Amino acid sequence: MPFFFSGYAMNALPVRLEAVIFDWAGTLVDFGSFAPTRVFVEAFAQFGVALTLEQARGPMGMGKWDHIRALCDDPGIASQYQERFGALPDDAAVTAIYERFLPMQLEKVAEYSDVIPGALQTLREIRERGLKVGSCSGYPASVMRRVLERALAGGLEIATVVASDQVPRARPAPAMALKNAVELGVADVAACVKVDDTGVGIEEGRRAGMWSVGLLLSGNAAGLTRDAYQALDEVGREAARARARQAFASAEPHYFIDTIADLPSVLSDIEARLASAERP
């Protein structure tokens, strides 16, 4: 006989969604995810290392120390550092860059934290469906406090927020997504959806056993400002989608959408699949 707990039989599959867990930059706020990329470029420049925006975007979604470590492992970046300092960048060098990066990020993050169009309406629809809402970010908690202040001023509020320095291992490990599930009181991770604009964020959701949705045009993968996005014709948008899909290929999201405004129809499709006994 199955054992019942919180409305679920222990050997039963979920038949409806319970929660949606969002990334922040490039997903809910900061169209194009420019706040971290530009500050990475500026922080490395202070050590005599030239970074392009494209290079800075590469490891996006990771915790910021890990992001800097990944950048320093790039041969071209490492060789610049070695030429300047006479040695390859070790963990102490990464920490030094991070300590330069963090106050710069704290100072500038609010400038890039405007709410992405469609986010408020989508969150309202999600809550009207009776679903819980959580979130997580590659930002540390100190930076997230600034982001949340700006988001609240724009009418966006999410109570459950997990920062990268609040778990033992951040993305692509599943800890932040799973911490959300625990704090939200979710009974089955298969009844959760993770929405993100980075490959490691999508992988985080998959490793957590959740449905994963990749954002093609509002975030890091496309790297478009809101004005640039709006100026694209359909041919240009399809080209940007193709580039983003390629960037997400190894992460294998269950769904692709352009921006958060397109999420409600995906949630309806996932609920239909759950009702048919599918799992992520």
UniProtKB/Swiss-Prot annotation:
Catalytic activity: phosphonoacetaldehyde + H2O = acetaldehyde + phosphate + H(+)
Textual note on the cofactor: Binds 1 Mg(2+) ion per subunit.
Keyword Hydrolase set for record: yes
Cofactor: Mg(2+)
Gene Ontology MF terms: magnesium ion binding; phosphoglycolate phosphatase activity; phosphonoacetaldehyde hydrolase activity
E.C. designation(s): 3.11.1.1
Entry's Gene Ontology cellular component terms: cytosol
Source organism, top-level taxon: Bacteria
Residues that bind Mg(2+): 23, 25, 197
A Pfam short name: Hydrolase
GO biological process, one term: DNA repair
The keyword Repeat is assigned to this record: no
InterPro entries attached to this UniProt entry: HAD-like_hydrolase_sf (IPR050155), HAD-like_sf (IPR036412), HAD-SF_hydro_IA (IPR006439), HAD_sf (IPR023214), PGP-like_dom2 (IPR023198), Phosphonoacetald_hydro (IPR006323)
Keyword annotations from UniProtKB, A to Z: Hydrolase, Magnesium, Metal-binding, Schiff base
Residue positions of the active site: 23 (nucleophile), 64 (schiff-base intermediate with substrate)
Subunit structure and binding partners: Homodimer.
Family: Belongs to the HAD-like hydrolase superfamily. PhnX family.
General function of this protein: Involved in phosphonate degradation.
Name of the protein in question: Phosphonoacetaldehyde hydrolase
Origin organism lineage: Bacteria, Pseudomonadati, Pseudomonadota, Betaproteobacteria, Burkholderiales
